[in-house]
Amino acid sequence: DALPILELNFRCPYCYEPHENITMTSDIVEQIKKYIQNMIDKFDNLQISWFGGEPTLCENIILDISSCVKELQTVRKFNYAATMTTNGYLLNIEMFIKFYEVGIRSFQITLDGWNHNETRPHISGIRTLERIIDNLRKISTLSSEYEYNIIIRHNILDGDQDFSWYDYLSSLFAKDKRFSILVALVSDWGGTLVGSMPIS
């Protein structure tokens, strides 16, 4: 896993992240690129999983390292795959295409159903669900030449039985096989406010 940043732009009550304003420095970026260049001949495969913090907050760092890997791949011929776990708020279609072009083809984005705006608010307190859905709908308009995979992770609280959320997602993405849904129970991952939530 690669953690280019620890800062987040959401304030989820179940979040275990430290919310520190720490971003990968340019020196560290160069060290990572040199390390990959020096080590890649020893391996046939390279996989990078971008995590955080919220990775889309440091788009340029990810593009820098990923572009280096793509350039290396044209010369040294190794298999390369990259994934990203993101809240999707900043992942508009323009950013998505940039990531796609440097080899990031798989994304996991968490949506908390109809409770999303309460459990996954922006740091400023504003709603986030509508913007994420809009981003995903626009990404879905990309032609079939864009072969990507987006996993929509649905975190559910104990007793959450409103299945209309799945009907809603189905109406948006069921015809696009590049989208899939992962259902997961919210657990005590160490968030400071998780005790106030109905979890199993």
What are these regions (language model features)?
Residues 1-97, 102-105:
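Conserved alpha-helical substructure of the radical SAM core
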Residues 9-11, 55-57, 88-93, 105-126, ...:
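Conserved radical SAM core fold
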Residues 17, 50, 84-85, 111-113, ...:
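Long, contiguous hydrophobic alpha-helical segments, chiefly transmembrane helices and signal peptides
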Residues 26-30, 60-63, 93-97, 117, ...:
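Generic alpha-helical secondary structure signal
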Residues 46-48, 82-86, 107-109, 148-154, ...:
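Hydrophobic faces of well-ordered beta-strands that scaffold small-molecule active sites
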Residues 69-74, 104-107, 128-132, 173-175:
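Short, surface-exposed linear patches
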Residues 96-109, 170-181:
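Structural recognition of alpha->loop->beta junctions
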Residues 119-200:
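Radical SAM enzyme [4Fe-4S]-AdoMet core and its adjacent flexible, acidic
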